[in-house]
């Protein structure tokens, strides 16, 4: 009975790994496509007509070395996680338990992103929306929590498979 349960848990871990792999690949693709704009932000997009008095502050934030470094590091970490997820998928496909490292690294990077955005995103008011930045932060945190679920489920099922060994 335990062997059947273990196989079932590994199959579930494999499925959640695949979901995370697809999400990570899509995220990496959008990060790479957007990297040019992050490394060389177009000042003409940051107009006072759209962003009000916060336009200059937003451009300076977008053009800061911290924002650029964070974007490049994010692409590198995403590539690393994607490679690790592919390796984990191969092992799980064979019914072999895999390390939880890519899932923990994914969660670490999600939390780092949330902290970074909370600390360094300027508070802005856009055409009367005083809580605009707060609203975007809440939506962003919610989306990041959703994207974290496959990693969390993978970890849970890998632990369950270990206990069935």
State each model region's role.
Residues 3-6, 55, 79, 101, ...:
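Short amphipathic alpha-helical segments that mediate assembly, nucleic-acid/protein binding
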Residues 68-84, 109, 144-148:
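Generic alpha-helical transmembrane segments
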Residues 1-41, 157-165:
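Cytosolic juxtamembrane helix and N-cap/initiation of the first transmembrane helix
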Residues 6-16, 20, 60-70, 92-102, ...:
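Membrane-interface helix-boundary signature
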Residues 31-45, 85-98, 120-127, 154-165:
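Perimembrane helix-loop junctions in membrane proteins
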Residues 41-69, 116-142:
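Interfacial non-cytosolic loop connecting adjacent transmembrane helices
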Residues 14, 24, 112-160:
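Alpha-helical membrane-associated segments of multi-pass integral membrane proteins
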């Amino acid at each position: 009975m335990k062997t059947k349960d273990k196989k079932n848990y590994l199959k579930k871990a494999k499925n959640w790994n695949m979901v995370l792999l697809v999400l990570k690949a899509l995220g990496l693709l959008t990060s790479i496509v957007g990297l040019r704009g992050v490394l060389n932000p177009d000042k003409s997009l940051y107009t006072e007509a759209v962003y009000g008095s916060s336009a200059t502050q937003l451009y300076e934030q977008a053009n800061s070395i911290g924002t650029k470094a964070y974007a490049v590091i994010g692409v590198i970490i995403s590539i690393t996680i994607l490679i690790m997820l592919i390796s984990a998928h191969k092992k799980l496909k064979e019914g072999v338990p895999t390390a939880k490292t890519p899932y923990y690294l994914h969660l670490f990077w999600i939390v780092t992103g949330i902290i970074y955005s909370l600390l360094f995103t300027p508070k802005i008011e856009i055409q009367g929306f005083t809580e605009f930045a707060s609203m975007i932060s809440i939506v962003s945190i919610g989306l990041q929590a959703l994207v974290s679920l496959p990693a969390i489920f993978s970890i849970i099922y890998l632990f369950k498979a270990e206990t069935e060994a």
